[in-house]
Amino acid sequence: MGRDLRPGSRVLLLLLLLLLVYLTQPGNGNEGSVTGSCYCGKRISSDSPPSVQFMNRLRKHLRAYHRCLYYTRFQLLSWSVCGGNKDPWVQELMSCLDLKECGHAYSGIVAHQKHLLPTSPPISQASEGASSDIHTPAQMLLSTLQSTQRPTLPVGSLSSDKELTRPNETTIHTAGHSLAAGPEAGENQKQPEKNAGPTARTSATVPVLCLLAIIFILTAALSYVLCKRRRGQSPQSSPDLPVHYIPVAPDSNT
């Protein structure tokens, strides 16, 4: 049968065999063929495991993993990483994703929970204030004794208290002045707006009037040209032609 094949058919058969061998070769990070469904953007060998920084990056941006024939593919946002099924870092990432302790979705949930957590210091302060308000009978008795044993304040302290109240009075006066100045400032702001109103209207009417004047001049010039053309095209009055009389001989019968 080999003798019956022509040289051209032998070459064609050889090319088909070479193409079949090329397609069955394993590609870069793709077991089976170049056009397989388990493609890897980066293949990490078992002899050189990834660094700690790279592992942290994978834990943060990892989305899913797929089990292939001899390796596992980890899918990230725009690329993929593959490693052997029995590699320790592969097993660690797989268990982390199964337990939902890492990955892109887990980092989003953690960030959302941080925003929702309430602040604890105000609650503790409120509880401390509530506990300080509760007094035992012994504490109340001590407070009354201390209040009765307090010495009376001298006159100088009273004058100092009065001096301390003066800044408050000055602040009240300044606040009243600012409140009174508020409506005046509003009226002063309204007056420039009222003055600016007529000027804006006049500035808007000036171009309109100029446009109307230009249109009027153009229509007058056009009507003048048309009237001049009509006068030139009208038939001029022709002069009177002379009348020629032919003498007629008188009839002999008459």
UniProtKB/Swiss-Prot annotation:
Signal sequence residues: 1-29
Source species, domain of life: Eukaryota
Family annotation (InterPro entries): CXCL16, CXCL16_dom
UniProt-annotated location(s): Cell membrane; Secreted
CC annotations in GO: extracellular region; extracellular space; membrane; plasma membrane
Sample GO molecular function, one term: chemokine activity
Residues annotated as transmembrane: 206-226
Stretches the record annotates as Chemokine: 32-107
Keywords in alphabetical order: Cell membrane, Chemotaxis, Cytokine, Disulfide bond, Glycoprotein, Membrane, Secreted, Signal, Transmembrane, Transmembrane helix
Keyword Disulfide bond (UniProt): yes
Membrane side Cytoplasmic: residue ranges: 227-254
BP GO annotations: chemotaxis; positive regulation of cell growth; positive regulation of cell migration; receptor-mediated endocytosis; response to cytokine; response to tumor necrosis factor; response to type II interferon; T cell chemotaxis
Disulfide bonds: 38-68, 40-82
Record PTM text: Glycosylated.
UniProt membrane topology term: Single-pass type I membrane protein
Region Disordered, annotated ranges: 146-165, 178-200, 231-254
UniProt topological domain (Extracellular) ranges: 30-205
Tissue specificity remark: Expressed in T-cell areas. Expressed in spleen, lymph nodes, lung, kidney, small intestine and thymus. Weak expression in heart and liver and no expression in brain and bone marrow.
Residues annotated as glycosylated: 168
Family recorded in the similarity comment: Belongs to the intercrine alpha (chemokine CxC) family.
Protein task: Acts as a scavenger receptor on macrophages, which specifically binds to OxLDL (oxidized low density lipoprotein), suggesting that it may be involved in pathophysiology such as atherogenesis. Induces a strong chemotactic response. Induces calcium mobilization. Binds to CXCR6/Bonzo.
Official protein name in the record: C-X-C motif chemokine 16
Protein's organism: Homo sapiens
